[in-house]
């Protein structure tokens, strides 16, 4: 069920996700974790929206429900939803877990076009987040929000500019995170070039 939902793209496949959630698939047992997984697969593909998320949260009032709800809101494929998630990640006082789930929801490769506008914003707020948030929140933000959704020479150049200029005096831990993320993107670009 997870593999199917995670790769569903056609209207019929997306309708099947809704059918799974509705309990009409014989022999499929859906626990809370699988329900959220299937639901979020639908959210990130535009099948379900904010009202549906509210309904799911009403069904699952546990701590896990709140975490998955935060992820679901960040998975909504719209510029407005991504902007709200980015703002929450970088400015709100979220718990470590809610913050992590929001980051993971925000940064989804299905939403590359929507997320392209957030590359510069990431590098603009990085130092402030590092200086004003606790270590775990700052480290999670630096790592999970690194703009891996736009694998390009331009993103590598922006990371290098941050290392050379904006973040030249940043903490060793933050610089290491950006260096490692930049290097991973350089390797990805080389792999792409080799495949062509």
Residues covered by each model-derived region:
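Long, ordered, helix-rich scaffold segments
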Residues: 1-196
